[in-house]
Structures are given as C-alpha cells and as structure tokens.
Amino acid sequence: MQQLEEVVGQAKAEIEGVNDVATLDEIRVKYLGKKGFFTEQMKTLGALSAEERPAAGAVINQAKQQVQDALNARRDALVEQELNQKLAAETIDVSLPGRRIENGGLHPVTRTIERIERLFGEMGFKVERGPEIEDGFHNFDALNIPAHHPARTDHDTFYFNPDLMLRTHTSGVQIRTMEHQQPPIRIIAPGRVYRNDYDMTHTPMFHQVEGLLVDEHASFTELKGILHDFLRNYFEEDLTIRFRPSYFPFTEPSAEVDVMGKNGKWLEVLGCGMVHPNVLRSVGIDPEKYSGFAFGMGVERLTMLRYGVNDLRAFFENDLRFLKQFK
C-alpha cells in the first residue's frame, strides 16, 4: 500500500513536469501501458488468496485511476497551451468564422443608363456609340456650329489641338450614324462627355444620352409623345410636363423640357427639338424629303432627381457609405 502511494506521488510529479504531449505519452506507457507498472501490479494478485484479491485489486485500481486523472488533466492543459501559442504566433486565426463576401452593386449612374436604354429600347430605339476623342467636324461643324459661331465659346472644351478634342456631347454619334445609314433612323447615344467645369452641379466628366429619329414624317408632336412616355416611365409618376421654347444651333424649333417637382417648382430635365436642315444637309440627307428630331439629357441630373441626391460630385468620390445605398 505504501509502495503504491509512493508510485502515485512519483507519477504525478513526473506528469506535472512534462511540457509536451509526446513526453506525457511516454509516462502513460510507463505506468499504464501493457508492460507498465500497474499492469505488473495486477499480475501479482494471483499470488493472493481469494479473500484478499478484491481488496488488493480495488487499491491498485484506485491508484491507477489517480494517475489516469493526472494524465488527463495535464494533457488538456498542454493542448490548450499549445493552441494558445499557435494562435499568438499566427497572423490569421484560421479557426475564426469566415467573413461574408458582400455582393457588389451597380453604380447609380450605370443603373440610370441601363434604365434609359431599356425604356427607349421598348420604343424601338437602338443604342449607338462613338469615339470620346472627336474632331471639329463631328463635334461642331456638322451640328450647324461653324468656326465663327458664338456657341463654340459656350462649351468649355478640352482641346488636344485646334481640330481634336474630348467630345462635349454625344451628338457626334448621331452625325456618324447619319453618315453611314439612310433613314429611317431611330437611335440613342449614351456615353461620357467632357467639359471644363466643376461645382455642385457640374463635373469635368459626366454622362449624356442623346436621341435621334429621322424619317419622312417625323414631327414635333411625335417628339413630345415619346418624351412624355419616357419621363413618366422613368420617374414612375404621372408627371406634369411642359415644353419651354429654347435655342440650340442644331435644332429648329428647340425646346427645353421641365417637370413639376414635389415642391411645386419646375425642374429642367432635358433639351430637344427638330433637327436643323443644315445638319441633315451636312451628312447628305435631303431635308426636303426627311425630317427628324433630337433630344439630349444629362444622366447624372436624372439620377440626382430620381434618388434625391443634392451634390453631383458624390457620384464620383467612391464613398462606399454613399454607393451602398443603391445596391
């Protein structure tokens, strides 16, 4: 009995002094293995009488259990210690739950362009695109804006040289389409345009969508009907709309289109008019046979009105707090 107590004490001391699981397993084999101390002790029970064996066996098992409990406790402590050291050494805790991958969303300007393309597509308009670096003929001359015309000074144009520039509108796409396609023509031209201006309602780069219809019997009445349908479908409201006389070099007559805001004030949303005969002549279309109408709108302005944004510059600052609202 005294010998067992000494062995248990010795085993516990060895167990407490172990600093790794492998050494701890060696101690387990030494005391509890098939050839370990307690296995050998159980073999000595055969030399005892039948009356003595139960009591002696119980003492051996009790001592064996004490060693087993000490082994289990030390193993748990070593495993926890090893895990803590590993976590402290790792820059990434691979046991942490994964981070959810957020789905991206379309930029509000992109959403507006797609919406405009879809609405006009339902009315039979095709999408045409053209170069953003434009020459003087397609950006000005063919649009009834000759070199001496005062309207050229109205555009704060970015020039590369006297006849090459960043386009100030997508009207050049209309000219290129009419150069290569005979009427009937029914297109819209979305894209980036550039003007040297920057404030709450202007940026050096912005987006426009311009539309063109050329046919034998195109009329201002048809133009009004198309724009009425577009605006009411775009804003999803039965808006009050007015056409206000205006001036553009490339259309005659010309008008600007306003919608009544919720505050009772008129808001300008786009410009339009009948294509000027000089524009048709510049691309080889007979204005005696064909007529046409054109319209143009700023995408950012329509986006601001639809979503209630006050500062145009917010669309280009890449602030996720702002952009996530449109997902």
From Swiss-Prot:
Main localisation: cytoplasm
Gene3D superfamilies: Bira Bifunctional Protein, Domain 2 (3.30.930.10)
Compartments it resides in: Cytoplasm
EC number: 6.1.1.20
Positions of disulphide bridges: none
Catalytic activity as recorded in UniProt: tRNA(Phe) + L-phenylalanine + ATP = L-phenylalanyl-tRNA(Phe) + AMP + diphosphate + H(+)
Keywords: Aminoacyl-tRNA synthetase, ATP-binding, Cytoplasm, Ligase, Magnesium, Metal-binding, Nucleotide-binding, Protein biosynthesis
Enzyme class: ligase
GO CC terms: cytoplasm
UniProt binding sites for Mg(2+): 252
Cofactor note: Binds 2 magnesium ions per tetramer.
Cofactor(s) required, per the database record: Mg(2+)
GO molecular function per UniProt: ATP binding; magnesium ion binding; phenylalanine-tRNA ligase activity; tRNA binding
Entry's family note: Belongs to the class-II aminoacyl-tRNA synthetase family. Phe-tRNA synthetase alpha subunit type 1 subfamily.
PANTHER family: PHENYLALANINE--TRNA LIGASE, MITOCHONDRIAL, PHENYLALANYL-TRNA SYNTHETASE
HAMAP family listed in its UniProt record: Phe_tRNA_synth_alpha1
Protein name: Phenylalanine--tRNA ligase alpha subunit
Organism in which the protein naturally occurs: Aeromonas salmonicida (strain A449)
